[in-house]
Design a protein with these regions (language model features):
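N-terminal cap/lid segment of alpha/beta-hydrolase-fold proteins
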Residues: 1-13
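Conserved HGGG/HGGXW glycine-rich cap/lid loop of the alpha/beta-hydrolase fold
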Residues: 12-66, 70
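Active-site loop/oxyanion-hole signature of alpha/beta-hydrolase fold enzymes
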Residues: 57-100, 276
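Conserved hydrolase catalytic core segment
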Residues: 91-134
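Flexible "cap/lid" loop of the alpha/beta hydrolase fold
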Residues: 118-158
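Alpha/beta-hydrolase
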Residues: 140-142, 148-227, 246
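Conserved loop-alpha-helix segment in the C-terminal half of the alpha/beta-hydrolase fold
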Residues: 212, 219-262
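Catalytic active-site module of serine/aspartate enzymes centered on a nucleophile-bearing elbow/loop
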Residues: 254-295
């Protein structure tokens, strides 16, 4: 049976869910910031061979939602990850990060150099300035009507209005999830997201980034990542394949897979192939390290 519970962290409690048993666990970090665990539910496919743990970062989903916006910083979420890992007793660990979750994973690794069996990054940039530039290049390819709506409402500061949000959906359906209809887990993440976290750290949209991590960039430190690393993304991903390729070239002992006809949430669009790639990568890492399936 799945295990669920709460962990006390700075600022409140975070909710977690653990499925599967045996093997070295996979701890999964959701994106956003503030986008909840729900859209990562396909990763529970991995639980037939090992324990898989999801949690809602503070400020979203089933976790507490404190009103103190000073909590919404990269250092806070790094220390939250340290606390979650310690509370769950995860001495050995594969760390998976989706989008912002991969950025969090990289910062955690660079700050603490923790013991990890592997790092798995899905649609995660190493540089927000580059992300902003490349997302705006994708924005320029939207239909003129959508671009006009985005420009007009950003100039007026009306980015919460339905017309602006509707134009954003055009971008999302091209570069975030190309499935129609969207999966239920993704819809739940949109409903349960912590938008104050997103707006404080990111800003009003994926390409209009005005928040406190707009200058985040670890490109020059990628060579310090020494654990086996798998970099995953989609052909149409808002985290551009060229960006991921540069990360692959800088991270020693890394592998890279780009899924054709897929986007940011390639684990939905190419689910079976995605899970096979992740399982093969983890199996290879563990075989080279002499880790048995029952470790």
């Amino acid at each position: 049976m799945p295990e669920e519970g709460f962990i006390a962290v700075a600022g409140g409690r975070v909710w977690y869910r653990s499925v599967g048993e045996g093997g070295v666990p996979v701890l999964c970090l959701h994106g956003g910031p503030g986008f909840t665990h729900n859209y990562l539910e396909p990763l529970e496919d991995l639980a037939d061979r090992r324990r898989v743990i999801l949690y809602d970062q503070l400020g979203c989903g089933r976790s507490d939602r404190p009103s103190d916006t000073s909590l919404w910083t990269v250092p806070h979420f790094v220390e939250e990850l340290v606390t979650v890992r310690d509370a769950l007793g995860l001495d050995r660990l594969h760390l998976f990060g989706s989008s912002w979750g991969g950025m969090l994973a990289m910062q955690y690794l660079l700050d603490h150099q923790p013991p990890l069996e592997s790092l798995i990054l899905c649609g995660s940039p190493a540089s927000m300035p580059r992300w902003i530039k490349e997302c705006n290049e994708l924005r320029a390819q939207l239909p003129p009507g959508d671009q006009e709506i985005l420009d007009r409402h950003e100039a007026a500061g009306w980015t919460a209005c339905p017309e602006y949000q509707g134009a954003l959906v055009t971008f999302y359906r091209r570069h975030v999830c190309r499935m129609d209809p969207w999966p239920a887990g993704l819809e739940r993440s949109f409903t349960e997201a912590g938008y104050d976290v997103y707006h404080t750290m990111n800003g009003p949209s994926e390409f209009t980034v005005t928040g406190n991590f707009k200058d985040w960039d670890v490109t020059d430190r990628l060579g310090e990542i020494r654990v086996p690393t798998l970099i995953l993304g989609g052909e149409h991903d808002e985290a551009r394949p060229s960006h991921m390729r540069d990360m692959h070239e800088r991270i020693p002992n890394s592998e890279m897979v780009v899924f054709e006809d897929a986007s940011h949430l390639c684990f939905y669009e190419k689910r079976e192939e995605f899970m096979a790639r992740v399982n093969d990568f983890i199996d290879g890492v563990e075989a080279r390290a002499g880790i048995s399936r029952n470790s």
